[in-house]
Amino acid sequence: MVLKVKMGDIGVAKSPESIETLLGSCVAIILYDRGKKVGGVAHVMLPKSRNTAERTPGKYANTAIPELIDRLTKLGARKDKLTAKLAGGAAMFKCNSNTIDVGKKNIEASKEEVRKVGLRIASEDLGGDTGRTITLSLKDGSVLVRKGAELKVI
């Protein structure tokens, strides 16, 4: 079964399931515990929420990661065994120098927040100007990244 994660949402599951999301300027924060075969994806839309009691914690990098870790530990994962992968953050719209590059800001915030909780980023597929679809296999933690006809495993 494939669990689809919508914008600003968080999805967690156990093997043999997989988790999928479609990304543009948003960033997927992907956490996986290889020993327990448990993983999750947060579909981060924006860098930071000033409200730590956010009702939609998956929407922001600073609230998504603690919530994702909490949900994974409830499924049996151990925080010290989690590895992180990141994907997305494309510059989807041509912008002038006065426009904020949301994709770039999402990348920076996601990396910062992953480091803050002491996790290592094992691999990433970030930036560019093309959207992508990612699929996390909970059997082995591999992430298939599809950009048009291009396929890549991170």
UniProtKB/Swiss-Prot annotation:
SUPFAM superfamilies: CNF1/YfiH-like putative cysteine hydrolases. One of its GO terms (biological process) is chemotaxis. One of its GO terms (molecular function) is protein-glutamine glutaminase activity. It comes from the Archaea. Keywords: Chemotaxis, Hydrolase. The keyword Hydrolase applies. InterPro entries: CheD-like_sf (IPR038592), Chemorcpt_Glu_NH3ase_CheD (IPR005659), Cytotoxic_necrot_fac-like_cat (IPR011324). It is an enzyme of class 3 (hydrolase). Pfam families: CheD (PF03975). It catalyses: L-glutaminyl-[protein] + H2O = L-glutamyl-[protein] + NH4(+). The keyword Hydrolase applies. PANTHER family: CHEMORECEPTOR GLUTAMINE DEAMIDASE CHED-RELATED (PTHR35147:SF1). Probably deamidates glutamine residues to glutamate on methyl-accepting chemotaxis receptors (MCPs), playing an important role in chemotaxis. Belongs to the CheD family. This is Probable chemoreceptor glutamine deamidase CheD. The gene is cheD.
